Amino acid sequence: MGDFNSNEDNNNPFNNVLYNPYIVDLYDTTNNNNNNNNNNNIISGFNCDSSIFTQQISNTNNELTIPLTQSIQNLLPPVQQQTQLFISPNNNNNNNNNNNNNNNNNNNNNNNNNNNNNNNNNNNNNNNNNNNNNNNNNNNNNNNNDINTSIDINLNQLVYSTPSQQITNSVQPIYQCATQSTTSNIDTNINTINDNNNNNNNNNNNNNNSVNNNLLSMCQDPTLILQIQQLLLQQQLLQQAQQQSVPLNIQVPTTTTPINQQHQALLVPQQKQFYGNVSDNSSPETNFSYASPSSPSSTQSQSSPYEQQPLSPNPTISLSSSISVTATTTTRPNATEKTKESSLKSKSKSNEKDKEREDEEEDDDDRPKKRKKFDKNVYKGVDLGDELLEITSEEFQAYKNNFFANASDKKTVSALNYQFRKIKNRESARRSRERKATHVDELEAKIAEIEKERDNYKKENERLRMELDQYKLQEKQKSAGSIFDYISIGSPTTQNFSKNFGIILFLFLFGSFILTNTTPNFFNTNNGVINPNLVYNANSNNNNNNNNNVNRFSVNGVHSTQQYFQSQRNPLSNLDEDSLESLTASQGVFSTHFVPEQPSILLNRESIRNWATLPQNSVASLSFEKDNALKTIENANLDKSKHNVISNLNQLQQQQPSSDELMIDQKEEKNCNNNNENNNNNDNNKNSDDEKGKEIEEIKRKSTTTTISPTRYVNNSTISLLVNPTSVIGDIPDDLMKNSNVTTFGENSSFKFNFLIDTQNFPNGSNDISKAFFDNENQQMTVTSVIIAIQKSPKTPSQQPSTK
């Protein structure tokens, strides 16, 4: 009871009609695209007595038309719920009031009997109603053949009001009447609808009553009250569905055969999808087919007014019915729509889920992963797996002590040790990474600071360069009118250099000019040297001892002022023979050779053609015996003076041969005069010193007759003479000590002589210089450099020291 889908109501013709496959669907499911704008009109599960509609239709002459174009599409959008509109002929219409009352009473009695039977059996009475309707139709064939009423349902008037609102407005007085009634007998069979019985009862009461009276009688019917309550509940649901914009499909079944309700005709519109301007027609094409429920393939009735061509863009459907209109609504979804909508919903849900998953994954990537904390008191086996990446060595050691303290298996012990090593390595690597990161951060900070300092230094350098350029420009402008502008060429740095160079050059030239005019030859390297002369004491008569000879060195030196700052120097050509006397002998008196004021005996290198250079700054040491040293030095001085005179004479003879001859003659005459004088003196002193005079004459003759070959000289050699303390014999007179030119040798004393070495007699230079001084093998000498000329005379066995 109370359920449309229960097994008890399987034979109910009303339920069969709800699921009738031949119900007309005025709005095809394939045309859903054009009808998604105004989806607000829904009718579902409405079953009402046909007499209500017949009475209102008879009283109100409103034309109802159903358009199949955009108007109905906007009004009735596609939904899973489907609305069916049943229009069936009913013989018990109010128009039958003109018929005989007897027939109506019979029909009413039959209907009452049938209704009672149906109530007892708890079944729907639609079949009985159909039978009664058939009986009534048979009794009223003559009348019904004359009555052919056409009902035009114009749904354009319902555009601004939903079907649920229209139904509410039409049923509102019925609902008010039902609430005022106090009927307590309510049929528990809610699903049974007794439209024909209600109509027959109304006809039995008063066939001529108005619509209001019929409504009052209907208000007391409990089934109608329940139906109205259901309708109001459905209206609320429809309003909620409208707010959620749920589309609906409406099916409108129509019947046109007035004779037999079993063979009711149905309008089956077949619509094609409208593709705008692609098809030939501008509106959806609609084809109607006419068939019966029992024989779907039966031929169409010739009297059917629904065999029409495709309608215009705004068509209307004319529904002809002889008696009444029955409107019912059903909500059965279509299978194809279910699949499409389910697929769309599933796709949308899957897309939403995918988006949610992506968002969650992104959030998970951003968030730090939360992992379960390792519990060292829970046994998890030997191999901890991925937990080794998280736990510390202390936790692992505690876990090992809790569960594997007394482990004896080698595999477990090795596995635990291996895991412990891995944890240790991970921790050490982490610490090293941290240290590296800290060091890197520190280095980066230092680098940043250094870069900042470098940038600051660059800026400071640029600023200083700008200032320097400004100062240079200012100095250039100031020195524009100076004297040295003609020297300055180029940049300021080159100008300053050129100025300084010009000043230095000017000073150098000026100083050289002054030196050449006020000082001696500055550029001549042949400077003044010391001329050592030996003083030999020959006073043998006073001493009466020939062996006791006193050695004296007389140094005729040139003062410093005479050496380097004399404006004029005399060459060797200006020397006279008188100035060459190195020794003077007088009985019992020492006489020294006085150097003239002018350093005439200084060597002029212009007269020396051949020079040889020996090693510089070398040391020559000489050790002389008492007599040999004196003789050697004396002979060296004599040879030196003779060589200078001869060389000078040779030069003069080459220049002036006539004058040279005269000079030779004069010298010979002088020599003769000297000899004569000496002879005279000797004659006067024959008694005192005859023997000594003879010896002196012989020495002079030998010295004058000696020939000296031309020599070459070696420069820059020094000889050191070392004298033993026993070589000094006797006392030196006071007069001799007062003379600054005389130098005596004491203990460990030394004296240096500068000589020029004759390369002809000494071809090996200083290595052979000892031949000029030594006669014995016990004498040694090493020579470094010599400046003063030395010439060795040939040795004779009767050679004795000269007193001249």
UniProtKB/Swiss-Prot annotation:
One cellular component term from this protein's GO annotations in UniProt: nucleus
UniProt GO molecular function: DNA-binding transcription factor activity, RNA polymerase II-specific; RNA polymerase II cis-regulatory region sequence-specific DNA binding
Stretches assigned to the bZIP domain: 415-478
GO biological process: endoplasmic reticulum unfolded protein response; regulation of transcription by RNA polymerase II
Recorded superkingdom: Eukaryota
Keywords, ordered alphabetically: DNA-binding, Nucleus, Transcription, Transcription regulation
Biased composition (Low complexity): 90-145, 292-334, 672-685
DNA-binding listed as a keyword: yes
Main localization, broad class: nucleus
Biased composition (Basic and acidic residues): 335-356
Entry's localization field: Nucleus
Classification via SUPFAM superfamilies: Leucine zipper domain
Disordered: annotated segments: 86-148, 275-371, 670-693
Pfam family, one: bZIP_1
InterPro entries, alphabetized: ATF_bZIP_TF (IPR051882), bZIP (IPR004827), bZIP_sf (IPR046347)
Gene3D superfamilies reported in the protein's UniProt record: 1.20.5.170
Biased composition (Polar residues): 275-291
Positions of region (Leucine-zipper): 443-450
UniProt-annotated stretches for the region Basic motif: 421-436
PROSITE patterns according to UniProt: BZIP, BZIP_BASIC
Function field: Probable transcriptional regulator.
Family: Belongs to the bZIP family.
Name of the protein in question: Probable basic-leucine zipper transcription factor C
Organism: Dictyostelium discoideum
Gene designation per UniProt: bzpC
